[in-house]
């Protein structure tokens, strides 16, 4: 189709739009933004006639690669360490995709621009396609991998797991609160424009290095759609910028969206890339190096900073703090240690680090061994049942962390933890920005302006609170993380399946009572709480 005929077809579509003049339409998805002065253009002029043949070709390539992987015995070559982490990743990622599809009607309803409505409808179809091919990838892994346990329960496990629910919070951010905040700034302007770079470009590169060429095929197919989504987001952003009343809301939402994306995506993808790989070539990029290239240079410097010419205040301080957390404060390494601590309630197995891993981490992050090496040696020592408890219940110099109320990633950079009483409850936050998000941004008023559409961060947000005072064996059983024999745990702190005596069972973990740090915090006196928080921030090992 020529560009001229495409433009004519697009113009015809906009002629079919209808705006009633005799009544005010009912608002289905509310927003506090205003668009009376907004320009109404769609720079890409997206239409279905050119869209479907392109997507059909992409799907053919994806399913052809899946067939080729089976015929080519890919699963004899792929690293187990890598595929185990895919049990968690592929249980989470289809949910944000389908949430993004659900977000498109919110954006269509909130944005009075017939031109861009068609592009948003196309994006909705994209997101459904993405979720579908990711679910099919997960099914193929389950059917062909040596240990399907975990892959076969991901939809259930994702919703009740201490790690999966972090991803659920992330995806629900696309469809809750103010329609523009959720469906445009949080989803499109930040998540899709920035963090899909590490998610769908850097991570597939790591997959290929571990013998998995299916994930790169699927996720490059996904990423190739993102340019259109970025265009949709930028168009709506420019519409919002046309009205000065929207500027404070945009600046609020950029701070919230950037920080929550960093907290969740960097925690997950950084861990998958750095602790899920067996490729320890010294010239291989660390996650910090990937982040500097794909997020700092490609997004922050080329996309965010130019927005200053429109009068927006860009969250430079939060970008620099995110970089500092990754490079100087060990954010990804803390997340990996937290996931490994929780192995009994995982539905994936976490491989121990070896001397080769230690050497690579020390090369990329000088000082890594002095902070994390001893703990991973303890993880290796406590890998098998019979002589010890799971590592979370052994004295190894590690205190189980408090959960952040906002992003739901624990307060792992302990010196930065914030403790405040909000809505008559003592809450813990991983950072000042997460506290601000809960106490200031998600409220009915912002800087003296009513913001009734923002909503609140409510519900049972702390996984630990749901299981406070329960025996570990009962928690695992209630979650359903037990293999077909009715006793062996799905999660294991090693990859050795050959010897049944090395596999942990419900009996091996029974007798360990789980305590929620946040429940205990609310039960403390003021003096006890102050002492506990001070010790936590200082990194001292004290009872939760």
Predicted features by range, described:
Residues 412, 430-431:
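Zinc-coordinating Cys/His ligand positions in small cysteine/histidine-rich zinc-finger domains
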Residues 415-423, 441-448:
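Short cysteine/histidine-rich zinc-coordinating motifs and their immediately flanking basic loops
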Residues 197, 201-276:
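Long, repeat-rich segments with strong aromatic
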Residues 397-403, 423-426:
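Short metal-coordination and nucleic-acid-contact micro-motifs, chiefly zinc-binding Cys/His arrays
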